[in-house]
Amino acid sequence: MNSIPVLTLLGVTALLPCVPALTCQKSSAQAVRNVAELPLRWWGAGEKTCEVSEGCQDLIMLLYNGPKVNLVIIKGCTEVEDQEPKVIWLRTGPGLSVVSYTRVCRHGDLCNDVNSTKILEELPTPTVPGSLRCPLCLSNDSCENAPEQVCPVGSTHCYDGVLRLRGDGIRTNLKVQGCMAQPDCNLLNGTQAIGTLYMSENCDLIGPQALDCNSGSLETVRNVSDLHLSWTTGWQTCEAGEGCYETVMLIQNGHEFHMVLTKGCTRDMNKKARLTRHRTGPGISIVSYVHVCRDRDFCNDLSTTDPLWTPPPDTELGTLRCRHCLSTGSCVSASELVCPAGSTHCYSGVLSLRGGGVISDLKVQGCISQSQPGCNLLNGTQTIGPVDVREDCGLQLDALKCQHGTLKTIQDISKLPLQWTAGQKICNVGEGCQDTLMLIENGEQVNLVLTKGCTTAKDQEAKVTEHRTGPGLSVTSYTRVCRKKDFCNDLSTTAPLWAPPPVTAPGTTRCPLCFSEQACENAPEQVCPAGSTHCYSGVLSLRGGGIISDLKVQGCMSQPGCNLLNGTQTIGPVDVSERCSPPSETTELSCYRGVMFELGNGFAEEPVKWTAPGSQVCAPDEICQETLLLIDVGQKSAFLGSKGCSSPGAQDNIGVSIFSRLPGMLVASYTKFCSSHLCNGADSSSVLLSILPRPDVPPPGDVQCPMCVELFGSCKSTDSVTCPRGATHCYKGDIALQGGGLTTRVSIQGCMAPPIKPLLGDSKTIGIFSAEESSNYRHEDDVTSAPSLAWTLRLSAWMLGLSALLSSLYAGICPLC
């Protein structure tokens, strides 16, 4: 995405620091005129109240081509820092020449008051005719049958290309033919942006062309009195062959309506604009608009709700009364209303929307008319454009808050009962809260595994299960799933599971005693309690609910065999398995294990140490892996790494991926999957840096962006830094990473260069990590705060063994002025 706001909807405001907002002149224009008309003047610019901290900008560009000149004017609000008036000649001729004027001010309202091209100095110097002849054209339409001109002396080549101009109110493909003093498609001398005007050129017009499409997504709930709505969008350059799509859905429910809008690039076949009325009332009504096109840039240009909505006819009230709600939040305060005549049933359900940048769970309660009651608000529709739609009438309509976190620890039994506190998380609508606790007693030690969080499992009353009671090793678990209230998974102590074991006389069997995620070599022997007849030696693997553990266990048992858990394979969300192959038969694979996150600067230049403090034994279908992700935005860098066992079924492989590079941010990864003993042993980030290209750092350009990388929490940087030349827009987004023992959300701000794509492209996995990217236009309700670890202030740390429970993030809001 570019730096233009993805969607601006009238009436939307934001809480910002208490600084007066400026009023700026607001207008944009593009036109081809005769040079003889210069200097040109303009008047009648509108006015716009900016966001707090924004300034006013003036931007003018003139492209001279013989007797013709193309004029671009942009006035309005901008986040760019103040800039004194600056005139730059991008090309001086002979032949085609380009000059620009830019200024950003904050010293007073309407300070962007330039109203003439006179500010751009003198016209190009007259020249003597030469011998070269070239077509002459400046047109927004076509250059067919363009007249020829005699080029000025010094012109050596004919230029023929399309200049794409993209800015606030400017969406132009300017056809240009004329004289130049050099070959190649370089009319702009490498310039890609002038202020907030983004530019590119294309001189290869044979074959499929990459379209520019309006792009963005929006979800809003409003009063019907706000209709009709209008909007503007951002834009993106598609891959060759892709088309532009737009999808709008309106749900009206009484005096409220819900609107979902998504636009962008697609590989779908062309579809003429189609209006579908999925439900017409009385009561709830639903209409959608779908369009896919390839006939021109920005052909997905619907900008108003006019085609979708007409005021419904007045209807008499009936006798049915239903609760009324249309909300992406809560329906707790929904009121009961009298339905219009013809309504036969009350609807209550959750409409889930996924796709096209839309992630929403809309709670709907209202009146409908249908022959049979049921969960069929959309009359069987399952997709609307790129959006998958699903409804569920069996879920509660409010998202629960649950205690959230994981813990693994080995303690002396004398310390029982243990207590803990947990973080919290907002679940998806329909999910419940779960508590899972497992205790394994072995002599004087106890292994505790705890996981809390959200779950899709059905409600389950608190249940204590004794999987093995001893003598010797004993295993007990506690599981519960609830939805009756927020934070109902409130287990905070081992007390419900544990009571001091009865005193038993010692027996005659002696066995090694071990609890470890590392190794059990040279484990001390213990005298087993009476009744113990065999020694147990195995590896207990736990996977699920945020738990990844391979626990080596040696101790006393009252029966032979590899059956510590008496056949149990799942405990809550955790899958459990055990392996007891004797040493002579073992084919166990050991891998280094640990998670690294480090924040600093210069990581793209100098290697960072990357070693693991421990190892683990993998399951039979797992191999070793190491994954390293580098994010370098210029002034700040971050490394995130994982070593351990892979997901089941992985194959040997080594790879380096570069997702983004200079002149924008550098985002790259190193991954290795291998199947020999401790083969994931890279000890520094040089395994990645040694392969990355080392281009020369470009000189500073014209674009300024905030630069930030945050591993825990959101970027709050407001200071802008000048981007390298070639960067054309600012990026702001989050990347959620999960896997390999790491769960975090990385917040990123920085410079980006064309093509305008997500930072990770289409990548959903990075080695062992699953990755989900969301940019700054994503709906706020869809984002949950990244959990904060108890030792966040240590900017470099390894997570191994005992995991701290997670705590919530809170943010302050400045009062309105």
From Swiss-Prot:
The gene is Cd177. InterPro entries: Fert-Immune_med_protein (IPR051899), LY6_UPA_recep-like (IPR016054), Snake_toxin-like_sf (IPR045860). Expressed in neutrophils. Glycans are attached at N115, N189, N379, N566. This is CD177 antigen. Residues 1-21 form the signal peptide. Disruption phenotype: Mice are viable, fertile and are born at the expected Mendelian rate. Slight decrease in blood CD11b(+)Ly-6G(-)Ly-6C(+) monocyte and CD11b(+)Ly-6G(+)Ly-6C(+) neutrophil populations. Lymphocyte and myeloid development is not affected. In S.aureus-mediated skin infection, recruitment of neutrophils and monocytes to the infection site is transiently reduced. In thioglycolate-induced peritonitis, recruitment of neutrophils is normal. Its main location: membrane. GO terms for biological process: cell adhesion; innate immune response. Residues 22-796 are extracellular. In association with beta-2 integrin heterodimer ITGAM/CD11b and ITGB2/CD18, mediates activation of TNF-alpha primed neutrophils including degranulation and superoxide production. In addition, by preventing beta-2 integrin internalization and attenuating chemokine signaling favors adhesion over migration. Heterophilic interaction with PECAM1 on endothelial cells plays a role in neutrophil transendothelial migration in vitro. However, appears to be dispensable for neutrophil recruitment caused by bacterial infection in vivo. Keywords: Cell adhesion, Cell membrane, Glycoprotein, Immunity, Innate immunity, Membrane, Repeat, Signal, Transmembrane, Transmembrane helix. It is found in: Cell membrane. The lineage of its organism: Eukaryota, Metazoa, Chordata, Craniata, Vertebrata. Found in a complex with integrin ITGAM/CD11b and ITGB2/CD18. Interacts with PECAM1 (via Ig-like C2-type domain 6); the interaction is Ca(2+)-dependent; the interaction is direct. Interacts with serine protease PRTN3/myeloblastin; the interaction tethers PRTN3 to the cell surface; the interaction is direct. It is a single-pass type IV membrane protein. One of its GO terms (cellular component) is plasma membrane. Residues 134-203, 322-393, 511-581, 705-774 form the UPAR/Ly6 domain. The chain crosses the membrane at residues 797-817.
